[in-house]
Amino acid sequence: MFFASSQELDANKRTRRVTSLHGDLPQPARDATLANLRSGDVDVLVATDVAARGLDLPGVELVVHADMPKSADTYSHRAGRAGRPGCAAPGVSLLLSRPDRAADVAKLEREAKVTIRRLVHIGERARIIVTG
């Protein structure tokens, strides 16, 4: 999961088997977070875009974009955490977006060269979108 800020990220941790990774963490804490994820001590990584690039996280099957990525490049790197070689299942990427962000979603589709399928509208504020 990706959030725009460390404050949003920390506010959204819900279970014991969730860990977080963001730029405000000192490097030893980041290393411990990744070690816990790789060892299976935690199931879910809630992260800011600090985790979008350069991390080898095998076995990731689902990426949830809780906030719109700032660019198509960021989207591609976030989504690239799922469906990597060696994954048992194809990767799925969920993008949570408000209805008033439809133009932003369309722009993301064009720039990232992806088709985003609208699945369901939830209330007045959120939309779940699947890509992949």
Where do the language-model regions lie?
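Conserved helicase RecA-like core
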Residues: 1-132
